Amino acid sequence: LAEVTMSIMQKQKARDRAAGYARDFVPLMKQILPACVERDIKVIANAGGVNVEGCAGAVRETARDLGLQGKLKIGIVTGDDILDRIDDLLGRGIKLRNMDTDEPLVTVRNRIQSANAYLGAQPIVEALDGGSQIVITGRATDTGLTLAPMIHEFGWAADDWDKLAAGTIAGHIIECGAQCSGGICQYEWKTIPDLANVGFPIAEASSDGIFVITKHEATGGRVNVPSIKEQLVYEMGDPRQYITPDCIADFTTIQLADDGADRVRVFGIKGRAATDSLKVSISYSAGYKAVGTLVYAWPDAYEKAKAADGILRARLDRLSLQFDQIMTEYVGANATHGPLAGEPSSDLAEVQLRVGVRGSDRTPIERFTKEIAPLILTGPPAVTGFAGGRPKVEEIVAYWPALIPKSEITPHVEIMEV
């Protein structure tokens, strides 16, 4: 669940009380539920969004349609959604300060769209221990989804920090799917085979905390030490303090070793006690934006795109339009590396002009969208790329990370019979 996804789901639920969860999860479960029951395969997913009960109910109805009554239980984990508690929390002095800016949440109180604490593995473990074959959560850590079945299966103690850290790192490695099995891998990327049929990663865990990352045979991609290393540094932060609700993992202790074709053994991991806080993901409305694009062709593609940007800005100034920010990128010249790219070649085949504006007032953003198309006939020559029509105004949903005392969050576990 991406940060912005929760706000989208809150809006969906506001329009339809039965909505607010990952709708594509239910048809996927329809495909695999019979096999899960037959082979005793457990499924853990944070597909519940802001309506975990609704998602679980839809899965239950699907299971009944498949004739699986009485053959499985669905665990429901809630307690992460604190949107309705914001005023109470602020009133009791819990400021929910922005972790990046240190601003108190009260500065954006009237624009909040969603607020969810990241739950860890323990409530999922409780659901598994209660016999759940399917466990559905709302906001939970990606690592907790992987750690929970290890705790359930091996009976790890809640203070066995090294093993909890190992399970956490296993979750970190596989949380982005094929990103660790060849997808977007920089190391010798041209030689990675058959990404069209890329194999998703598997973590083979053992009770001592050592695990192996692999993938299914006869699938594409590659699992090797470089592919695992690249994933390890993804969204890592301080390598000595990878903080989760369950523990703090020390990435500097990780050891990797090839364990055969498409197999990497991960071991030596150390951890320590978790903090007394949970992270909260808050989304809020932050104004509006619009982005317009045009493509200019050789010769002088970059110069034409720059000239078009100058013309556009002059016209916007003449209209006295006020924006919080206006940003220009030249895709194909320097959009990725910015000033580090140096001066673009004078012989580029084509350059896309990409201009975006943002602001708190929708009116000037709307007016901006009407100024891109005129450049087609009143700007530099050899222009294309306008078939998509006028740019559209979009609401900006911003992210507000905060911390909350663990004592303020009480996960709730319910087990539903099919």
Regions from the language model: what does each represent?
Residues 267-418:
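C-terminal non-catalytic interaction/assembly regions of soluble proteins
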Residues 2-3, 47-56, 139-145, 360-362:
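Gly/Ser/Thr-rich loops at beta-strand to alpha-helix junctions
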Residues 15-16, 40-50, 135, 352-359:
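Short glycine-rich or small-residue beta-strand-to-loop segments that form or flank ligand, phosphate
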Residues 164-270:
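A conserved active-site cap/scaffold subdomain adjacent to cofactor or substrate pockets
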Residues 114-128:
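Active-site glycine-rich loop that binds ribose-phosphate moieties when present
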Residues 24, 65-82, 147-188:
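Catalytic or ion-translocation cores adjacent to nucleophile or general acid/base/metal-coordination motifs
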Residues 69-73, 180-195, 239-258, 315-331, ...:
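Flexible, glycine/charged-enriched surface loops at secondary-structure junctions
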Residues 2-18, 37, 82-110:
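Gly-rich Lys/Arg/Thr-decorated short loops/hinges at beta-loop-alpha junctions or inter-strand turns
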